[in-house]
Amino acid sequence: MAYIAVPAVVDSRSSEAIGLLESFGVDAGADANDVSYQDHDYVLDQLQYMLDGYEAGDVIDALVHKNWLHHSVYCLLPPKSQLLEYWKSNPSAIPDNVDRRLRKRLMLKKDLRKDDEYNQLARAFKISDVYAPLISSTTSPMTMIQNLNRGEIVYTTTDRVIGARILLYAPRKYYASTLSFTMTKCIIPFGKEVGRVPHSRFNVGTFPSIATPKCFVMSGVDIESIPNEFIKLFYQRVKSVHANILNDISPQIVSDMINRKRLRVHTPSDRRAAQLMHLPYHVKRGASHVDVYKVDVVDMLFEVVDVADGLRNVSRKLTMHTVPVCILEMLGIEIADYCIRQEDGMLTDWFLLLTMLSDGLTDRRTHCQYLMNPSSVPPDVILNISITGFINRHTIDVMPDIYDFVKPIGAVLPKGSFKSTIMRVLDSISILGIQIMPRAHVVDSDEVGEQMEPTFEQAVMEIYKGIAGVDSLDDLIKWVLNSDLIPHDDRLGQLFQAFLPLAKDLLAPMARKFYDNSMSEGRLLTFAHADSELLNANYFGHLLRLKIPYITEVNLMIRKNREGGELFQLVLSYLYKMYATSAQPKWFGSLLRLLICPWLHMEKLIGEADPASTSAEIGWHIPREQLMQDGWCGCEDGFIPYVSIRAPRLVIEELMEKNWGQYHAQVIVTDQLVVGEPRRVSAKAVIKGNHLPVKLVSRFACFTLTAKYEMRLSCGHSTGRGAAYSARLAFRSDLA
């Protein structure tokens, strides 16, 4: 059975249900036995009655958990005195678990009003001792619904309930005036048989449910045009709070299901509907619906080539794992010989990018992991390579489940990980008019220590001199490291014991303020040396502990002009590694592939298509009326981009229909103009409630993983005053 929710109420006849479906564009050429309607008119009365004593949101949030395919009913008990009177008149109705002394008295054929023992037993009697679970006037709406979903009969002492009809336990005379006159549609008289949920292939009802198996909501419904205010209120709340867990279904799919045709699937929601119903379907998906986060990768085989006296010698055979095919195509890499060093001995950008995008190297002779020496000085230095082949082509998902929400990203890399070089390369990559990773969108944890006076590294240096009992930095280095630059374990342990309170008392408080401020300025990529740095600073973004296929300590030694020199940086590197947690690191390539590969895939898909029809933005919307109150010109509404999107036109049109306004933030618009074009002012945003789920954006669209919060100004008027606003997400596209 499938349950289809449509925002309307009709009589509970199959002909009316079919007519209702046809009004939504469904071709319901089916027999009456195939489609039935659950008349939820009584629920509207209950909803109106409940809103007098409960918050609307609580009632609706409870009702959306009702399983409409499960038969259940409330059984309304009379007041205690009337219940005992009914039992006295009908001894056979007395439950078995009633106190035997009370039962014995009730079965006496005499007036009990002056019977002292009976009166004492009646006063001690509690209805809740006999009927459990029992709904009362203090029961929450969610508890009512949970009890309905668990059983078929739920006893209640109040008619202020929601989600099922009310069956009278006794004749109406025993209830006197306790029943609401507005609830007549809900009441089933005593002795009348309760109708069960019809077993049809398709049940049509008014209210969506996240507890009903195979529940679908008719897509394309204009909520604002719903005539019934209570149904409109329900759908507004459901679309705002529960939109991501409800299943939309198109009239086309409903038509095919009713007419027993093979389903013609056009959209992801239709495909999910077919899968939930376990029905075969034709995939009618064009080039517009391609999962751009599925990326083809290969393992690249290459040899380290040494040339001496005109003779070619292969000193090592290596495999570079999980190299994206799109990157190889972009760089024009093929089977050939390459020099991977620049004139100054540094690695070329293309080779550095290729290795960073991979999942490491393996020596084909020893089958062990191989870490490259970044130095150009022997031994074990690589100058020239010969690419000999590509094997093991397969597809990977570069957007795993850990990226559940659109949030900042914290990337933890050890010192000497080429962060500056990689960010310079990424800053230069622009695809479809979008900068992949602007340098302005990157924050380094070193900035926290550099804001101190003295800096964190200077403070550490002076304290360590005292521990070692030396006056100079050179003597400190000699005290910690042996001649092979390997630290003495006991002495490094002493330094680490001093490092912990410094990190806790000096670094962490400053880091909390720093990250609170930086994360309000945008969704930024934050680099740190140890994950403990971010954890102790209450960092709330995605936290990734990463590694690279290079010997980072060697890279530290060839970097000049660093605080304290190369050897002191090496000591700090050891300390940060001790400071990190025991979480297993992933390859840096797992993040870089997510940053670059989907965009290259999308570039192939939309090619030369009109950018106006393939571009969109999701951002915080501020009505111009609110801005004008703070001195802004009001030429247009305020809009602070949160996510920039590139996708085929059909995907953009689908995204336009989603409910973005359910996500909101406290936005501060400043009067500080940002240097550059277009004209804009900086802003801050603190998200309230849930973050934007990644799956809402769609796997068929590319979106920016970082953003800097700025409000664009389309005119040359003077800026207004800085102020805070409550803003909701809005979708902007030239197609709207």
Curated annotation (Swiss-Prot):
Keyword check for Glycoprotein: no
Signal sequence, renumbered to the chain: none
Keywords: Capsid protein, Host cytoplasm, Host cytoskeleton, Host-virus interaction, Inhibition of host innate immune response by virus, Inhibition of host interferon signaling pathway by virus, Inhibition of host IRF9 by virus, Interferon antiviral system evasion, Viral immunoevasion, Virion
GO-annotated cellular components: host cell cytoplasm; host cytoskeleton; viral capsid
Protein name, per record: Microtubule-associated protein mu-2
Function: Minor inner capsid (core) component. Displays NTPase and RNA 5'-triphosphatase (RTPase) activities. ATP is the preferred substrate for hydrolysis. May function as a cofactor of polymerase lambda-3. Associates with microtubules and plays a role in the formation, structural organization and morphology of viral inclusions, where the assembly of cores and the replication of viral RNA occur. Together with mu-NS, recruits the other core proteins to these inclusions.
Annotated TM spans: none
Molecular function in Gene Ontology: structural molecule activity
Organism: Reovirus type 3 (strain Dearing) (T3D)
Upper taxonomic lineage: Viruses, Riboviria, Orthornavirae, Duplornaviricota, Resentoviricetes
Pfam families with a match to the protein in the record: Reovirus_Mu2
Self-association state and partner proteins as the record states: Interacts with protein mu-NS; in viral inclusions. Interacts with polymerase lambda-3; this interaction stimulates the ATPase activity of mu-2.
One GO-annotated biological process of the protein: symbiont-mediated suppression of host type I interferon-mediated signaling pathway
Effect after changing P208S: Loss of filamentous subcellular location
